[in-house]
Amino acid sequence: HAITKLLHYAGNTEVEYIRVGTSGGIGVEPGTVVVTKNAFMPNLEAYYTTYELDQRIDTPTNLDHALVERLLAAQPKDIAFPIVVGNSIAADDFYLGQCRYDGAMRARKDADYRAKFFAKVHELDICNFEMESSALAAFCNRAKIPATMIAVTLVNRFEGDQIKSSAEQLVEFSERSQQVVINYLLSRKDLSN
């Protein structure tokens, strides 16, 4: 809210929000950059629930597809890492919400259930788990601000919960998401002055 209000008071009317981060991949290899077109809750609903006092408000969690296309168009053809466009699941937390087995408490669903769930969501073009996309999408939809998410994957959840990449690889992976945004910003002729 605060940043959006500041931008409004400063007279910035043509803003775009791009969240940059990391995620757990679902059927994509570590180091893949996922550009999110739609955010889903873990129940596979494409809305985010908030409350104003006692009133429930369900806000759609679709992100701006035109912004996604502009981001992709700004990338060099010979970019040295994979970029995919897909959907994301916003889990409630890092461990249980993603059915991980390496937290302080073990997830209640067994490995067979989890594997079937991952296969099901992968068929729905869901490429990653993270925790912010649905809230960001709902906020930006209500505020009528174009938005998307860019998150590099650190692990393929089909292969386990543990990150196996080296510290150097993780730094390089994180820089990939940032590079996608930098390429986009450099392509914007209206920002060159």
Residue map of PLM features:
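Metabolite-binding pocket within alpha/beta catalytic cores that recognizes anionic/polar moieties
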Residues: 1-73
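Non-transmembrane, aqueous-exposed alpha-helical and coiled segments at domain scale
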Residues: 4-15, 123-126, 185, 189-193
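Short coil/turn connectors at secondary-structure junctions
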Residues: 11-15, 29-31, 43, 79-84, ...
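Glycine-rich beta-alpha junction loops
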Residues: 24, 87-95, 135, 143, ...
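Active-site rim beta-loop-alpha module in soluble metabolic enzymes
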Residues: 58-123
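Generic non-transmembrane alpha-helical segments
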Residues: 70-78, 139, 180-188
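Zn-dependent metallopeptidase/amidohydrolase metal-coordination segment
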Residues: 134-169
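His/Asp/Glu-rich mid-to-C-terminal helical/loop segments that flank catalytic regions of hydrolases
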Residues: 157-193
